[in-house]
Amino acid sequence: MNKKLTDYVIDLVEILNKQQKQVFWGIFDIFSMVVSIMVSYILFYGLINPAPVDYIIYTSLAFLFYQLMIGFWGLNASISRYSKITDFMKIFFGVTASSVLSYGICYAFLPLFSIRFIILFILLSTFLILLPRITWQLIYSRRKKGSGDGEHRRTFLIGAGDGGALFMDSYQHPTSDLELVGILDKDSKKKGQKLGGIPVLGSYDDLPELAKRHQIERVIVAIPSLDPSEYERILQMCNKLGVKCYKMPKVETVVQGLHQAGTGFQKIDITDLLGRQEIRLDGSRLGTELTGKTILVTGAGGSIGSEICRQVSRFNPERIVLLGHGENSIYLVYHELIRKFQGIDYVPVIADIQDYDRLLQVFEQYKPAIVYHAAAHKHVPMMERNPKEAFKNNIRGTYNVAKAVDEAKVPKMVMISTDKAVNPPNVMGATKRVAELIVTGFNQRSQSTYCAVRFGNVLGSRGSVIPVFERQIAEGGPVTVTDFRMTRYFMTIPEASRLVIHAGAYAKDGEVFILDMGKPVKIYDLAKKMVLLSGHTESEIPIVEVGIRPGEKLYEELLVSTELVDNQVMDKIFVGKVNVMPLEAINQKIEEFRTLSGDELKQAIIAFANQTTHVE
């Protein structure tokens, strides 16, 4: 019964996040001091004569000074199963110093207590404050040794710096399967030191030898800014050893206490190996743009559209209209958003952007302040086989959205474009180039503001290469690459969505914003990294070359040489100087395309798109 009660109490405390724990133990500490001063007085004088205000003054001062000292030492009245004897000594010195300092102040005005009385108070306070901390470690140790379920995984932590210290401080759940055996750090000088009572055993290079010696089953990387090449090296060593490799969650989620101890570490993913830096949202500018407004997103069930909805939700718009053609994807995104965000009116709307009357009815009903147009057909080989659908959705659909924005007097429209719109050899890229022309054409004649945002591939989106590689690896291979020389620009879905929202905030006059995608990545190198992440080697999962598919290019471009970059509106967002065509001329071409089909339509769209790419 006692064991169950202690388990219940500990688990109850562990539900609290870091800040709540500090408040909880702060209350316990002041209670300990109040009890100590009362017991001390009774033991010395037999009864309580002074007025309660005297106790309040002395105890308040002592607790205030104690908290300042503990906070200065970084203990913050917390409890850790990794607490060292030095931490307990700091608590003792904190109680002693705060008590003596408070005594000195009170003695000048309220000469109530003797030195012997203060000594007794210090001893009692220290005992009561330390008791739960020591008990915590003992109970954890007994629970761990007595579990007998074989589930505790012997683990190495990579990183003895700030990330490692934060990890140690945050992962304190007594039922965790985490059994930290030692720490490895790039700095060999740290060998022999301890972090939270756990020894630094060596450097990364020592991982193979030390992992075998200590029978390690798992490695956790606690270095938020670790270089991608170092990630690869650690993964390669872990794969050879048959050891699972994980990473610490994002620092902000650990600091905020959003992860349960022992369950928050994550698998290393492809973004860690590509090393893209996350962009932060400009809260002040976007707050003005989005807060309290109605936002409409087309293609809201897709990878980019749904992420735009998530990012916009952080700025508390009044309403987000989730417009899409696929009811299942809209349903899933809608229910995800209403679970994650409160106080926002999410409106799921099933509509086809090829139906202008339906679009206009929705726009006039909800009166959005901004329309993010993410709906499009994006798969290159599929559109090569279905050029009519590419025309109807990407060209006619975009025209309908832009026209409805103008007719309903929506203040702003932001269209998602692609690097495949530059010198397009395929239907998909050509239709997106024409869509850019539609947006800039409407901007010339409408009171609404229009812009387009052009970027490359997004990691993990539906139809992208990452899910294909994952499926092929899960099936045992081979992983297929069209051409070992092929390169692509890559960006994460959250990063692309953030930049789209930022670019939209800077839109003034029909700009085509171009996102800085970093350096292009070889698809072959990407495939090798995916195999590495799976825990396999290329001998186990072969990578084969299968040839370029219809409409594909070896190398993608974000702009042509004549699309001079006028200026950079912010980090990673440039404004491209692109050709603008009168809307009447675009309408004529669209009517011409409507009469064509098959290869004739394909060639006509591609030819027109390439003619209009270059700046006059």
Residue ranges of each PLM-predicted region?
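Conserved Rossmann-fold NAD(P)-dependent oxidoreductase catalytic core, especially the SDR/UDP-sugar
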Residues: L241, Q256-G257, H373, H377-E436, ...
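Signature of alpha-helical transmembrane segments in polytopic membrane proteins
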Residues: M1-G150, K240, K247, V371
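N-terminal Rossmann/SDR dinucleotide-binding element
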Residues: L258-T271, G275-K367
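Strand-loop microenvironment adjacent to phosphate/nucleotide-handling motifs in alpha/beta enzyme folds
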Residues: K21, R280, R285-E289, G441-N457, ...
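Hydrophobic/aromatic anchor residues within beta-strands of the central parallel beta-sheet
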Residues: P348, A390, Y450-V453
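A solvent-exposed beta-alpha-beta segment
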Residues: Y45-N49, I139-V255, N328-L332, R339, ...
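Flexible, Lys/Arg-rich cytosolic regulatory linkers and terminal tails that connect or flank
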Residues: N2-D7, Y231-T294, D406
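Proline-aspartate-enriched helix->loop->beta-strand connector
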Residues: A211, Q215-E217, P317-E318, F363, ...
